[in-house]
Amino acid sequence: ETVTPTALVMAVVLPSGHTPPDAQGNTRPNEAEIPSHLLPMVQSLANIPVPTAAPDQAVRIQIPSINVDAPVVQGDGWEQLKKGVGQYIGSANPGHDGNVVLSAHDDVYGEIFRYLDRLVPGDQVIIYTQQRQFVYVVDRTVLVEPTAVEVMASTGSPTVTLISCYPYLINDQRIVVFARLQN
């Protein structure tokens, strides 16, 4: 099996890190969070095309309590997160045993996950595939360092993990929300 560069980078740093927007709203990946020996690889990933979702992969997410309704794209690299919520390649598909890992920005490109910190246990996270919807219920929220990749580990039951930078406009930590399948 060939190791993909994105998977290698994500094995040492969680997705979503970027520099604060400049006066024109431009931003870029936060290279300070990336180990120096992996920096050339990260820079080379900028133009990788976004894969098309298979029928059982996530295509949309809704989180009613924080007014999220956004597309889900495959991959969680810089270019993918410009288009919506990114599903970590290699994570489980919705409804399957394992961990569906989804990430999005909190302060650029739609600020999709800006209000993850407002989620409380019992809130719903609805994930759509081309075939059906899956309702997950929030269990807990934690703050971690960008290198805490263990939050993306596979699980023995159907779960979803939502990841974004935190706090707003500072982004030196990650907020991680865990939810379990309800239906």
Q: What label would you give each PLM region?
A:
Residues E1-N183:
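Solvent-exposed, non-transmembrane regions of membrane-associated and secreted proteins
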